Amino acid sequence: MPSVSPAGPSAGAVPNATAVTTVRTNASGLEVPLFHLFARLDEELHGTFPGLWLALMAVHGAIFLAGLVLNGLALYVFCCRTRAKTPSVIYTINLVVTDLLVGLSLPTRFAVYYGARGCLRCAFPHVLGYFLNMHCSILFLTCICVDRYLAIVRPEGSRRCRQPACARAVCAFVWLAAGAVTLSVLGVTGSRPCCRVFALTVLEFLLPLLVISVFTGRIMCALSRPGLLHQGRQRRVRAMQLLLTVLIIFLVCFTPFHARQVAVALWPDMPHHTSLVVYHVAVTLSSLNSCMDPIVYCFVTSGFQATVRGLFGQHGEREPSSGDVVSMHRSSKGSGRHHILSAGPHALTQALANGPEA
């Protein structure tokens, strides 16, 4: 997040995009909110490194096109072609919406730079969309991981909290919390940047990363138990690859931005040009998450693939979902239990591999 030294931008230095420091204008001596600095970072980068700015804008253009197509298709399938709105589907729909928001905010970034430089109102949609997407994406990725853990490892005890109404309440809380955090950060003009950076980094990034890492490890341990049948090996491998891919994408997309926040807070004398370049590269990596989420959570699942093939007139055999497997287990045993682990390794692996259908 951007900051400059107390001397202000007139000192000839490019502002650091870090968490929070006091910024004063030469004319009035008033503190400037961080949002005012975010709105002008493109001008700073273009004036210092025009080639890099053009390259990053080309990448953002590709992200916009790919994200619009993938997320638009995902939103249509999950909202219009998926009848069972399970908790996983609800979390995935909200994740797709956040990715669409950041994609739709990118054209505003081009328009602001070329046609409305210095217009804070014009820059607001992009700045708000970016930070809201980052906060919501982290939280919804965490929700999806926790939901997969409950469905696979704790299906019996989590039956009550894995209801659609509960998932909708969680999503509403995520949107409100992310919006409040985003607006408060953009309006910050105070001091004590180190304390705020560490607090935000722990709450926004390290805590969700810890939850995702621990629950991913627990799920992989459950999938790796010796009793798995041979015919379930292919689905088990696919499920493990999905979990690792989710964790890797989370690290690649969100770690650089938060690591840079902490680095600038601990090293306030970091060269301004270095800080500016690292900030823009980290923002680009974070935006890349908006067109990678549909690939991980939608196209990897067999149910989504079958629906997309049906839309394009290509019919293929669809694997039974985890709900089908559990229902078959109930009818054969007659016990009325939903415990996926007791339904066998094949059902356990499908519960993860079918993702939003479970």
UniProtKB/Swiss-Prot annotation:
Chain intervals for the UniProt region annotation (Disordered): 315-339
Regions of this protein lying in the Extracellular compartment: 1-48, 108-125, 190-196, 260-275
Entry keyword set: Cell membrane, G-protein coupled receptor, Glycoprotein, Membrane, Receptor, Transducer, Transmembrane, Transmembrane helix
GO biological process: G protein-coupled receptor signaling pathway
Gene designation: GPR20
Tissues expressing this chain: Ubiquitous with highest levels in intestinal tissues. In the brain detected in thalamus, putamen, and caudate, but not in frontal cortex, pons and hypothalamus.
Subcellular location as annotated: Cell membrane
Basic residues bias (residue ranges): 330-339
UniProt keyword Repeat, yes or no: no
GO cellular component: plasma membrane; receptor complex
Positions bearing carbohydrate: 16, 26
Pfam families: 7tm_1
Cytoplasmic side: 70-86, 147-168, 218-238, 297-358
Protein's recorded name: G-protein coupled receptor 20
Predominant place of localization: membrane
One Gene Ontology molecular-function label: G protein-coupled receptor activity
Membrane-spanning ranges: 49-69, 87-107, 126-146, 169-189, 197-217, 239-259, 276-296
Family according to the record: Belongs to the G-protein coupled receptor 1 family.
Disulfide bonds listed in the record: none
Membrane-protein topology: Multi-pass membrane protein
InterPro entries in alphabetical order: GPCR_Rhodpsn, GPCR_Rhodpsn_7TM
Function statement: Orphan receptor with constitutive G(i) signaling activity that activate cyclic AMP.
